From Swiss-Prot:
Enzyme class: ligase
UniProt subunit comment: Monomer.
Pfam family, one: tRNA-synt_1c
Motif 'HIGH' region, chain ranges: 9-19
Function: Catalyzes the attachment of glutamate to tRNA(Glu) in a two-step reaction: glutamate is first activated by ATP to form Glu-AMP and then transferred to the acceptor end of tRNA(Glu).
Identification of the protein by name: Glutamate--tRNA ligase
GO annotation (BP), single: glutamyl-tRNA aminoacylation
Motif 'KMSKS' region positions after renumbering to this chain: 236-240
Cross-referenced HAMAP family: Glu_tRNA_synth_type1
InterPro entries: aa-tRNA-synth_I_cd-bd, aa-tRNA-synth_I_codon-bd_sub2, aa-tRNA-synth_I_CS, aa_tRNA-synth_I_cd-bd_sf, Glu-tRNA-ligase_bac/mito, Glu/Gln-tRNA-synth, Glu/Gln-tRNA-synth_Ib_cat-dom, GluQ/Sye
Molecular function, one GO term: ATP binding
Cellular component GO terms held in the UniProt record: cytosol
Length: 469
């Protein structure tokens, strides 16, 4: 049997981290078993579903590289199929028309609550013949009243619900539109879904959906209900904890691999291993190893992973993601070094691509002023001689290579009989405008000869004016 899973978000908002983790687990289970992964947009809530939210979900999935084999399917384009099945169920007697008014239902629930009873439909119309009338009605599924629904959940083990506790679910509203719980069942059947991976908030829907599947003579898939994600304070995850849309993580400078690695470990583990490539995830992932307990979101851990991936991944690949941030910060990269070279130079310290982009600006454009603290410390009168000498040595270089630049700095320090820092630090501030950068020789090499000469001249003038003032 071919394993077939699905991710079925509702387009009422962005793709948040909880949804992304569910999608990842579902995707990994399919990929680990040479199966298929389906993307389905559950947009039956027409009032709350928006094209913008749908586009954001697709963009998030694509950015995470969670590719799908089928879809995206849209429930709103399948209403004819749902209505066909509803008509079939009415004819077979597994569903019925309910003419109870909203007022009657509300009164019934109030009485049940007052008596301490479970609030559920009392079956008033369950065994009545359909009326030849224009009265409004809903269609309800005729849920079994005896026995129980039992299923073995990959995460939670054996789960059982007594049928006597289950309502006769509404499967079509008064205006004729099918309901979420019904559409899900028909979709999973038609699409051949063999395993449903979703959040634990859907556990109570599962017995109802299983009963509908059995009434249709359809196979029942396996289930895996994953725990919710909490904030690091144990409260439900919210925006203040980092419960933002997936694309916000892109905007904040995270690599998709870092976010995926973080999400896969947020409830699943393989020994003590922390860092997983996508291939390792596929190799080791198992639904049965997902933790039952809720997991706490820790932004610091995500940042640590992101820093690791920026440092360890191919600079060309990191540069392909950095391009977006350079454009977002209005840094024109057409006049400067290759972006991959900048990544190699700056990746050791960068925590995010956003940070890396901001710290790379001096490679591509001139700065207006020297950083005050760095200038006060390193662009003093004693810097005038080393800056003047290194400028002449750099100007005399026939080849602008790392080795030649390094030798020029060494020769300057030797001739002046000073330590390398007495040359390197003023030179760094002169060329970058700040006191922090990669190795000075590498920095100069990437900035380029013409820019270096121009900036050193500017620094010499700055020091001279400071001395004379």
């Amino acid at each position: 049997m071919t394993i077939k899973t699905r991710f079925a978000p509702s387009p009422t908002g962005f793709l948040h981290v909880g949804g992304a983790r569910t999608a990842l687990y579902s995707w990994l289970y399919a990929r680990a078993n040479q199966g298929e992964f389906v993307l389905r947009i559950e947009d039956t809530d027409i009032e709350r579903s928006t094209p913008e939210a749908c586009a954001a979900i697709l963009e998030g999935m694509e950015w995470l590289n969670l590719n799908w084999d089928e879809g995206p399917y849209y429930q709103t384009k399948r209403f004819d199929r749902y209505n066909e099945i509803i008509a079939q169920m009415l004819e077979q007697g597994t569903a019925y028309k309910c003419y109870c008014s909203r007022e009657r239902i509300e009164t019934m629930r109030e009485e049940q609550a007052a008596n301490g009873e479970q609030q559920k439909y009392d079956g008033c119309c369950r065994d009545k013949a359909p009326r030849d009338t224009d009265e409004p009605f809903v269609v309800r599924f005729k849920n079994p009243t005896e026995g129980s629904v039992v299923f073995d959940d990959h995460v939670r083990g054996r789960i059982e619900f007594a049928n006597s506790t289950l309502d006769d679910l509404i499967i079509a509203r008064t205006e004729g539109t099918p309901t979420y719980n019904f559409c899900v069942v028909v979709d999973d059947w038609d699409m051949g879904i063999t395993c449903v991976v979703r959040g634990e908030d859907h556990i109570n829907n599962t017995p109802r959906q299983i009963n509908i599947l059995k009434a249709l003579g359809a196979p029942v898939p396996e289930y895996a209900h994953v725990a919710m994600i909490l904030g690091d304070d144990g409260a439900k995850l919210s925006k203040r904890h980092g419960a933002v849309g997936v694309m916000q993580y892109r905007d904040d400078g995270f690599l998709p691999e870092a976010l995926l690695n973080y999400l896969v470990r947020l409830g699943w583990s393989h020994g003590d291993q922390e860092v997983f490539s996508i291939e390792e995830m596929k190799q080791f992932f198992s639904l049965d190893d997902i933790n039952k307990a809720a997991s706490a979101f820790n932004t610091d851990k995500l940042i640590w992973l992101n820093q690791h991936y920026i440092k360890e991944m191919d600079p060309e690949y990191v540069a392909s993601h950095l391009e977006w941030h350079m454009a977002d910060q209005n840094i024109d990269t057409s006049n400067g070094p290759k972006l991959s070279e900048v990544v190699s130079a700056l990746s050791e310290r960068a925590k995010t691509l956003k940070e890396l982009a901001a710290s790379s600006r001096y490679f591509f454009e001139d700065f207006a002023e020297f950083e005050e603290t760095a200038a006060k410390k390193h662009l003093r009168g004693v810097a005038l001689e080393p800056l003047t000498l290194i400028q002449s040595k750099l100007a005399a270089l026939n080849e602008w290579t790392l080795e030649a630049i390094h030798q020029a700095i060494e020769d300057t320090a030797s001739e002046l009989d000073v330590g390398m820092g007495k040359v390197g630090m003023p030179l760094r501030v002169a060329v970058t405008g700040a006191g922090m950068s990669p190795a000075v020789d590498l920095t100069l090499f990437l900035v380029g000869k013409a820019r270096c000469e121009q900036r050193i001249s500017k620094a010499i003038e700055f020091v001279a004016n400071r001395v004379n003032s």
